[in-house]
UniProtKB/Swiss-Prot annotation:
GO terms for biological process: mRNA processing; RNA splicing. This is Protein SWT21. Belongs to the SWT21 family. Associates with snRNPs. It comes from Saccharomyces cerevisiae (strain JAY291). It is found in: Nucleus. Keywords: mRNA processing, mRNA splicing, Nucleus. PANTHER family: TELOMERASE CAJAL BODY PROTEIN 1. One of its GO terms (cellular component) is nucleus. Gene3D superfamilies: YVTN repeat-like/Quinoprotein amine dehydrogenase. The lineage of its organism: Eukaryota, Fungi, Dikarya, Ascomycota, Saccharomycotina. The gene is SWT21. Involved in mRNA splicing. Helps to stabilize the U1 snRNP-5' splice site interaction.
Length: 357
């Protein structure tokens, strides 16, 4: 049986003129956004990639330079058309999006057994640091232009029985917001733990451990003001909300009309500065919780942050996409230059749509 092609993630350029999609067919595709006069007729138009290249093995994790742009003329920075890709039994590698050539391989070899460690999660920050997460809750930090890690550590806490001590994701900040470092970075594990990564310290600090039936943290999203953290878990029908100042206690939850299953069609949530938090569904629609709600953690103005009552908040809106309702809308991300325009993965295809269109 032929394997279905699924989009794993989408990354917009910082200027909104192009975006990149990564798929489970080992392919990385780059798309140009049509001219402004043509974007009002995009609801049913599928896009053809401007460039594409294929690796010879599956892509476990990937990340793009936050300053990625086809029109980057800032000679003071390294070229922005770069993507880092992690796979099994292979070093983490930096590729050019334009020609698909490998530019640099990072040293991810385990010195004890001589094997390359699988990078399960990766992030590039605004200071060109590459963060990697692997098994045994190991985090390493690289300068983007150097192969050797400048910082490396792992948690000494052991995962509970049946849990995986793997760093599964790093904190994601809203595209289109202030591209500024917010100090320490959060990361999550498949053992439902949240850690703080701070290269000024010599160890990972565990900030949260949730005893739940959920199958592990897969995304950590931050509100634009940086005060609230939204945690997406596998095998869960809700997104947990935490106050960043107190990550030990769940503040509220966003209620989902489905359960996030552990399969190849990974549904991703996304926060942007204009529309709040959006997420695709198995039936091809898009759920949305507005910016005002997201920026205040779902806490009504008459409530105290210390109020012990947890509110389960349903979606404020559900948008239809005029596409096949039998195929999940797995990834949806807004254009930073035009928030009403968003790139949508629908199975293995990519399209551009407008909210309300």
């Amino acid at each position: 049986m032929e394997k279905k092609v699924i989009c794993q993630d989408i990354f917009w350029s910082c200027d909104g003129t192009s975006f990149v999609s990564v798929h489970n067919d080992f392919g990385i595709r780059q798309y140009l956004v049509p001219e402004e006069g043509n974007t009002d007729k995009l609801n049913r138009n599928l896009l053809l990639p401007f460039t594409r290249f294929f690796r010879n093995q599956s892509i476990v994790s990937c990340a793009i330079d936050p300053f990625y742009s086809l029109y980057n003329e800032n000679s003071d920075r390294l070229a922005g058309d770069r993507i880092v890709v992690g796979g099994k039994n292979f070093p983490l590698q930096l590729y050019s999006l334009m020609d698909g050539q490998c530019i640099l391989s990072y040293d991810t070899m385990n010195k004890i057994n001589g094997e390359y460690e699988t990078v399960y999660s990766v992030k590039i920050d605004v200071e060109s640091r590459v963060y990697t997460g692997s098994c045994r809750n190991k985090v390493a930090i690289y300068d983007k232009s150097r192969r050797d890690a400048v910082w490396m550590n792992q948690s000494t806490k052991k995962a509970s029985k049946g849990r995986q001590s793997i760093i599964s994701c790093f904190e994601e900040q809203p595209m289109g917001g202030q591209a500024l470092s917010r100090g320490s970075l959060l990361c999550g594990s498949y053992a439902n733990e949240m850690f703080q990564v701070d290269c000024r310290h010599q160890r990972l600090e565990r900030l949260n451990y949730t005893r739940t039936v959920a199958g592990g943290i897969v995304q950590i999203l931050t509100s634009d003001n940086g005060r609230y953290v939204y945690v997406v878990r596998r095998n869960s029908d809700a997104i947990s909300i935490y106050d960043r100042r107190n990550l030990q206690h769940e503040l509220n939850v966003l209620r989902l009309p489905f359960r996030i299953h552990h399969n190849s069609a990974k549904l991703k949530a996304y926060i942007d500065t204009a529309y709040g938090l959006s997420m695709g569904t198995p039936r091809g629609t898009i759920l949305n919780w507005g910016r005002d709600l997201v920026e205040f953690g779902g806490v009504p103005s008459h409530n105290s942050v210390e109020d012990p009552l947890i509110t389960s908040i349903p979606p404020e809106s559900e948008w239809r996409t005029n596409l096949d309702s039998t195929i999940p809308a797995t990834v949806v991300k807004n254009c930073p230059g035009d928030p009403e325009l968003f790139a949508l993965s629908h199975g293995g295809t990519i399209s551009l749509c407008r909210f309300g269109g």
